[in-house]
Amino acid sequence: MLIKHTASVQWQLWIVAFGFFMQTLDTTIVNTALPSMAVSLGENPLRMQSVIVSYVLTVAVMLPASGWLADRVGVQRVFFSAIVLFTLGSILCARSETLNELIASRVVQGIGGAMMVPVGRLTVMKIVPREQYMAAMTFVTLPGQIGPLMGPALGGFLVQYASWHWIFLINIPVGIAGAIATLLLMPNYRMQTRRFDISGFILLAVGMATLTLALDGHKGMGLSATAIAGLVVAGVAALAGYWWHAHGNSRALFSLRLFKTRTYKVGLTASLLGRIGSGMLPFMTPLFMQVGMGFSPFHAGLMMIPMIIGSMGMKRIVVRVVNRFGYRNVLVAATLMLALISLSFPLVAMLGWIWLLPVVLFFQGMVNSLRFSAMNTLTLKDLPDRLASSGNSLLSMVMQLSMSLGVSIAGILIGSFAHHQVVTDSPAIHSAFIYSYCCMALIIALPALAFARVPADTTTNRTLTKEPGTGSTRLQQ
């Protein structure tokens, strides 16, 4: 139990918990503020997806290096640096006067965010006994669950009653306190490390960044066709280069032996495709409510809370659902249900049934959470122990990458159908959102074809179980 920890360990757990809170709060607080940011910066609200993409893509790129840095340099130094970078990025975001300045500032913020959560997990592993690890992780991740719940409403409140700058300024006092506490209270644990695959890291980083920028380049950044073609060629070449680099390389960042496990290969591919569609939802929903329906920022933020409550509630029963119906049936059904629910949301809103919107969003959150949890455990469940850590790291990176791709595609869709002409709550913008949601529903539904290839479940020797005191799952043999 946590009450058995010494005072110094308790303080260290609180430091990690606040790091989790800062990082997860920032993933949702910005979405509600995008239309107001656009007005302040003189930009089109339908071109603001780069503010989210820059942060999420940076997190995806930097994740593989964070654990190695913590082991090599020490968790205290890396965690302190993460908080400082995140806080500095927040200050730069608040001072931004152009969209390009804001995007660059979000990159700085993303570097800090990428190091905060994985290094926090390593810290907990080192400061508590193994038998108390799950209880400690439950304690430090609870603020991380509260962050997404507070984010949309808090962001809407600050935008409506202060200004969008305050969604970043509120990070400053928390960041300063966290940085000081880290220096004073957190030991600088280090572990012996193997040589970091810098070549593989650079190749993967270049591949992910260039392909995502190419996708967002024309609508979001105004790049020419020649520049976009160059980015695509560079991205494909970098990823092909990594495949050649990793072939037969025992020190590769991610071993190609991972893909010899069928469920991992199918699960990772389906997770990438599935999360592209799901990644559109947190961006599209508040944008539609404000630009499409004329909701105030605070009202739009409050409307997002049922979706997050539904997501958190489903985590309590997901184990029983998967064990009862099996991975393939659950994933195919949840994918198709999510597509239908997502498509129904704008239709219900335009029919004037505002009272029904929280119900739709609640079920959307439940189904999305069910699919996420099942995708994660399916992907990792058959990996041998020696590949489990590497497989989990690659899955985490793919999750972040697919979210950035989803936001980019959502921005392309709504920008194309609206022709970048924004008249709030007008028939033209309604049509643009309907067309965008139809395309989004199709993108969400397509991974059902991949999930249909998941092998039939054999639950005689494998049972999905829930870890005590957490929302996470594991497999019993």
From Swiss-Prot:
One of its GO terms (cellular component) is plasma membrane. GO terms for molecular function: transmembrane transporter activity. It holds the Pfam family MFS_1. Keywords: Cell inner membrane, Cell membrane, Membrane, Transmembrane, Transmembrane helix, Transport. Its main location: membrane. It is found in: Cell inner membrane. The keyword Transmembrane applies. InterPro entries: EmrB-like, MFS, MFS_dom, MFS_trans_sf, Multi-R_MdtD. The chain crosses the membrane at residues 13-33, 50-70, 73-93, 107-127, 139-159, 166-186, 196-216, 220-240, 268-288, 291-311, 326-348, 352-374, 394-414, 432-452. It is a multi-pass membrane protein. It comes from the Bacteria. NCBIfam families: efflux_EmrB, PRK10504.1. Belongs to the major facilitator superfamily. TCR/Tet family. This is Putative multidrug resistance protein MdtD.
